[in-house]
Amino acid sequence: MDFIDMPVSFFTFPLNLILALLCLGLMVWLYKDRRKSVFVRFMLSPSATIIAICSFLLLALIVGCTGKREIVGSLPSVLIFLYFQTVLLFVIMRGWRHQTATGARLGAVRWRFLLNHAGILLAVGSAFWGAPDSDALRVRAIRDVAVKEAFHMDGTSSWIPYEIILKDFKVDRYEDGTPLMYEAVVDVDGKEVILRVNSPYSHSLGEDIYLVGYDSLAGESSQYCILEIVREPWKYAAVIGIIMMIAGALLLFIGGPARRNERE
């Protein structure tokens, strides 16, 4: 194993899910039965939280400024993601324990805290653990010809479990001839669908097909179009996490003034 580039493909489903559950179970056990250990006490300290936030933001800043997304797959980045999730999980468990230990009823639980923190954990965790299952392939759909071969971004070929056939292609243009919009009528696994730019077809749960290009010189006479198959089976978990964060932010916005008024 290279120290920098992790073999991400090795951790595809179900291994990534098993590892995620094992890590979750281990952290819960440590918090319940080894709460006074040096490791747990550090993870619950303000220093651990500051380090987690700063390292995560620094990683995001480096990736955003350099544009090198492959950095996310490096060993240091993996350790930062694991550390961030671990600290966040311990903070959530401590917050939940404080709520239940005081005998708080369900309606009195700080849902703002739980929704925000659990939402971040779910969004980051699904992106991290689901990365090995994510993939993007390009297909050259040919007019009236069944195609099953696709290509990864590194140029290697792969076979998809269904056929794609280009049936028709249309280009709408401005008066000066500049393309305004283009769409392709494609047969996908026996089903005829219409693909437009930024209007993908959901072939299955977590798999979308996008129209990304065509023969610009031939226009509507193009004998092929370029499709991109994006596989992100964990994206719905990330969406749920984002919704939880939005709900937590709304509760924070609604409940904040009331809490301040009570203190006054």
Which residues are covered by each model-predicted region?
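Solvent-exposed, non-transmembrane regions of integral membrane proteins
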Residues: 1-264
